[in-house]
Amino acid sequence: MAEIEELNDQMKVRREKMENLRDAGIDPFGHKFTRTHNSQELHEAYDEKTKEELHELALSGIVAGRLMTKRGKGKVGFAHLQDREGQIQLYVRKDEVGEENYEIFKKADLGDFLGVEGEIMKTDMGELSIKAKKLTFLSKALRPLPEKFHGLTDTETRYRKRYLDLISNKESFNRFVTRSKIISEIRRYMDGRGYLEVETPVLNNEAGGASARPFYTHHNSLDIDMALRIATELHLKRLIVGGMEKVYELGRVFRNEGMDMTHNPEFTTMESYEAYADFEDIMDLTEGIFQHVAKTVVGQDVLEYDGKEINVGGKFKRVHMVDAIKEVAGVDFWPEMTFEEATALAKEHDIHVEKHFTSVGHIINEFFEKYVEETLIQPTFVFGHPKEISPLAKMNEKDPRFTDRFELFINGKEYANAFSELNDPIDQLERFEAQAKAKELGDDEATGVDYDYVEALEHGMPPTGGLGIGIDRLVMLFTGTTSIRDVLLFPTMK
């Protein structure tokens, strides 16, 4: 309770100062202010100059930012202004700025925004500074900065009030700047390879393109139930049918499922589709995206992540799912076997057989998830997923039990999912119907039948390679972050 009273006392004092500014004819919530430099530009241009060189140059600058430190007494004061790029020191003398400007400085609290015009100089201690000539009040902060702005330690507050985290935690601020750069570079990479960025609906009559539980809503005007998209896949492939040939979309998708260190119900994906390509071409594309981000954003191929060194340079390992299971668990699924034989194997290995499992393929996937996933530390393409768990992927020509699909695993987690797209409308309808049956048997992640998409395929879709990358996990990898909430500006909270 004492903390609340103290906070209220501070807020009252700040409001009094706001009124004092108004009484003095100063607007506490200013207007447009034009800067000549940000803090980084000043440091890059003048950090190497000596005090004497700067004095001789007699340069002036105009800066603006949030007041983060303030000290001094009498007729001289020092402060630091913080902008997006960093901080710059202010040197304020009453005899230089005049009575009115010095009053502005005295009345300013930490957290307030000031604009400052003055001489670019260095102090006797060698710190680059602006020797103020004129101060402009830009915005009064009516609440104090948290915990003396040394960084929020309460993680829930950091997530709920991200703006405070960004003010007080430079590491967090830089992480989100890196996120923006990563997304920009992915766009640059895709655009440079002739892909068109497109936008597809977030609200759909049927949620498809992935195995996940959707969020539902109701469209009042049309009086129909709709689902938020769980993937962008089916609309993007309609564009391939329409002749766009190479498309991608960066956007939010929504899955009404559990939350943990690597899952948030609202997250960002990049999906791409390329006509006349197959899943092996898309492996090369995926490698290229990761390596382009490594080169342009972080400047290195070897990443420190979760106590491990992850090398994203060179060719990623490629292994068939069945071979991976055989290597790790010693169980061989290459020979043909009945569902009953596979079920017996599952029970021997303490693998639960769900009611909606109807084929050996489901059992193979369970073995992979139990035994193999967590062992895949370095970037690894696992391909050859069973047909039953890959309703949108093309069957492998040599062994139709499996599909031309891959997932990219790093540090035991999936980072990308891709395949040679199924373009046979009759086969696609049969797989949709099998999914619908699984849904009836209790598989709440199974999809229904999207007849409109099947109709689109009936008009002809060329052989196509498709890719989906989880952007949030990718950002986690490249920023060394183990919680997805630390790479989402506003994560979902209860």
UniProtKB/Swiss-Prot annotation:
Reactions performed catalytically: tRNA(Lys) + L-lysine + ATP = L-lysyl-tRNA(Lys) + AMP + diphosphate
Pfam families, A to Z: tRNA-synt_2 (PF00152), tRNA_anti-codon (PF01336)
Essential cofactor(s): Mg(2+)
InterPro entries: Aa-tRNA-synt_II, aa-tRNA-synth_II, aa-tRNA-synth_II/BPL/LPL, Lys-tRNA-ligase_II, Lys-tRNA-ligase_II_N, Lys-tRNA-synth_II_C, NA-bd_OB-fold, NA-bd_OB_tRNA
EC number: 6.1.1.6
UniProt binding sites for Mg(2+) 2: E414
Any one biological process term the GO annotation gives: lysyl-tRNA aminoacylation
Signal peptide per UniProt: none
The entry's keywords: Aminoacyl-tRNA synthetase, ATP-binding, Cytoplasm, Ligase, Magnesium, Metal-binding, Nucleotide-binding, Protein biosynthesis
Co-factor note (free text): Binds 3 Mg(2+) ions per subunit.
Assembly and interaction partners: Homodimer.
Family designation: Belongs to the class-II aminoacyl-tRNA synthetase family.
UniProt-recorded name of the protein: Lysine--tRNA ligase
Organism name: Lactococcus lactis subsp. cremoris (strain MG1363)
